[in-house]
Amino acid sequence: MLKADLRRQMLARRRALTHDELAQRSLALREQLFRHFEVARWHWLHVFLPVARQHEPDTWLIIHQIWRECPTVQVAVPVVQPDGVRLRHCHLTPDTPLVENQWQIPEPVSALEVAPATFDAVLLPLLAFDELGHRVGYGKGFYDRFLLECRPDVLRIGLSLEPPVTQIDDAWAGDVALHACITSEQVWQF
């Protein structure tokens, strides 16, 4: 399938999820992450904050478990820059105040900026992924550009509410592939 078709199809599927279904899948994603990855060994994790109107996975479940059980792991979140093209990355603590930006993405008001080369792992938002590790996001390229700024050994993990499609037909060389993708049913390794 083509990315544009996958975006439409997966957004429709996501919006059809009930609150309870989304909550159950989000819990399962958290359980899979902590079961299959040594989260406590990471120093810095970059994670997206969920946009409620998009029915994104509730990454707060992951963040709160890290704060409770992995006190040495620091969390950073993206902040969309005014140019609408780039991200910067800010340290998130339990006391960090957040506001929603123009796209209703929660972002830190004022927080320590963290360089992309700092991260050991990145949890990536996506609408779809394929069996080769390619992902389909919202189409702005934020994460492809960001991942190129990270260390080559950064672990790239997608969080998906749906299983993979066989192949994304218009994946291209500039797409940064995943190392793994977590679904509520299993972890896909690439």
PLM feature spans:
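Short glycine-rich anion-binding loops that position phosphate/pyrophosphate groups of nucleotides
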Residues: 50-53, 127-131
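N-terminal active-site beta-alpha-beta segment that forms phosphate/nucleotide-binding
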Residues: 1-114
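Short, surface-exposed, charged loop/turn segments at secondary-structure junctions
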Residues: 91-94, 137, 141, 172
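Surface-exposed, charge/polar-rich loops and edge strands
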Residues: 1, 12-15, 112, 117-122, ...
